[in-house]
């Protein structure tokens, strides 16, 4: 495997393409919040996010969800299948929290009777605005693709809700990204980590995710380590 070039460096990851249809995702120790207005570094965060993502991708693969995950390529690196990513993020919400509490007249922590699926346009300059199917189709995502993406997202939710519940964790909400592989299959990509999910302790409702950093709730690394411990116990 030969590195071709570094094609992308985001706020929390580097994406490095190889010459064999694979990609390395390198998780950084950087943490950002509020569209990059709040920044910090936490030693070990990249390792934790890589390991947690690997665990969760394996869980999903075992349940029949196709993901881009191939293996762990180092302490803070994953090797994954190269995908052509959709310009849309999918957010699945099970509990009133985050931005949803500003849009619905319900108390934070209220469990939803059924999950809410939201779409967002991946564009930092525009602040990743919420969109609907009509907007997504303008961006080149067909109705058939949208339905398949949303169906996969709901299956992921069912699998992970049960998985985390067994470990004393509430899966409040989470973000997914999808792409197409060379065979034209829609595949789950990106990461599944406390950077992209909202996790609460089932008893105390304490955050085990980036909200700890975002809202100064404590030590981010302690929260991520606690999550990792529960996944590996």
Curated annotation (Swiss-Prot):
It is an enzyme of class 6 (ligase). Its EC number is 6.3.2.6. Keywords: ATP-binding, Ligase, Nucleotide-binding, Purine biosynthesis. It catalyses: 5-amino-1-(5-phospho-D-ribosyl)imidazole-4-carboxylate + L-aspartate + ATP = (2S)-2-[5-amino-1-(5-phospho-beta-D-ribosyl)imidazole-4-carboxamido]succinate + ADP + phosphate + 2 H(+). SUPFAM superfamilies: SAICAR synthase-like (SSF56104). GO terms for molecular function: ATP binding; phosphoribosylaminoimidazolesuccinocarboxamide synthase activity. It comes from the Archaea. InterPro entries: SAICAR_synt/ADE2_N, SAICAR_synt_PurC, SAICAR_synth, SAICAR_synthetase, SAICAR_synthetase_CS. Belongs to the SAICAR synthetase family. The lineage of its organism: Archaea, Methanobacteriati, Methanobacteriota, Thermococci, Thermococcales. Pathway: Purine metabolism; IMP biosynthesis via de novo pathway; 5-amino-1-(5-phospho-D-ribosyl)imidazole-4-carboxamide from 5-amino-1-(5-phospho-D-ribosyl)imidazole-4-carboxylate: step 1/2. PANTHER family: MULTIFUNCTIONAL PROTEIN ADE2, SI:DKEY-6E2.2. GO terms for biological process: 'de novo' IMP biosynthetic process; cobalamin biosynthetic process. This is Phosphoribosylaminoimidazole-succinocarboxamide synthase. The gene is purC. It comes from Thermococcus sibiricus (strain DSM 12597 / MM 739). The keyword Nucleotide-binding applies.
């Amino acid at each position: 495997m030969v590195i071709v070039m570094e094609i992308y460096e985001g706020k929390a990851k580097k994406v490095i393409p190889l010459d064999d249809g694979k990609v390395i995702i390198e998780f950084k120790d950087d943490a950002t919040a509020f569209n990059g207005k709040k920044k910090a570094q936490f030693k070990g965060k990249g390792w934790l996010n890589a390991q947690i993502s690997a665990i969760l991708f394996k869980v999903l693969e075992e349940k029949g969800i196709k993901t881009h995950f191939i293996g762990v390529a180092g302490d803070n690196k994953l090797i994954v299948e190269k995908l052509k990513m959709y310009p849309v993020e999918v957010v699945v919400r099970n509990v009133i929290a985050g931005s949803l509490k500003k849009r619905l007249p319900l108390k934070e922590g209220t469990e939803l009777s059924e999950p809410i699926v939201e779409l967002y346009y991946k564009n930092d300059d525009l602040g990743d605005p919420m969109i609907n199917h009509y907007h997504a189709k303008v961006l080149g995502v067909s109705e058939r693709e949208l339905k398949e993406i949303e169906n996969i997202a709901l299956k992921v939710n069912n699998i992970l809700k049960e998985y985390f519940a067994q470990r004393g964790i509430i899966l409040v909400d989470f973000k997914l990204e999808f792409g197409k592989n060379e065979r034209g299959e829609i595949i789950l990509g990106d990461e599944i980590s406390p950077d992209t999910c909202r996790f609460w302790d089932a008893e105390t409702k304490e955050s085990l995710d980036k909200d700890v950093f975002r809202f100064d709730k404590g030590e981010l690394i302690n929260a991520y380590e606690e999550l990792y411990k529960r996944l590996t116990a």
